[in-house]
C-alpha cells in the first residue's frame, strides 16, 4: 500500500522536487507520468492541498491496481528525470485486471 505522502517522499528522495504526477491511458495501457512541472515553481497550477489530493488519488489507483511496488521500483532504478517538455512515463502492468480498468 502506498499513500500520497509516501509517493511525494519517493519523488523528493529521487529528484529533490515535488513533481506533478498524472495518469494517462494510451492504446489500452495505463501510464503514470512524472511531469516536469513541480510544486515549488511559482507558476505551478495547484495549491499544496490540491497537489496532496492529486497524489492521494493516484496512490489509491496504484493500490487498486497492485501497481505501487512497480512504480516505486521503477522510480528508484531509473536514470531518467523529468525535464521541460519530457515526462518520465512508467507503464503500470494491470495483469489480468486490465479489462476491468480499460474500456
Please place each PLM-identified region on the residue numbering.
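Basic helix-extension-helix modules of the SAP/HeH family
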Residues: 17, 21-25, 58, 76-79, ...
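Intrinsically disordered, low-complexity linker/tail regions enriched in Pro/Ser/Thr
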Residues: 1-22, 86, 90-103
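Short secondary-structure subsegments characteristic of cysteine-rich extracellular domains
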Residues: 49-65
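Charged, amphipathic alpha-helical linker/scaffold segments
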Residues: 8-54
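Secondary-structure junction/capping motif
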Residues: 2-3, 29, 72, 83
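General structural signal for secondary-structure boundaries
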Residues: 2-4, 47, 68
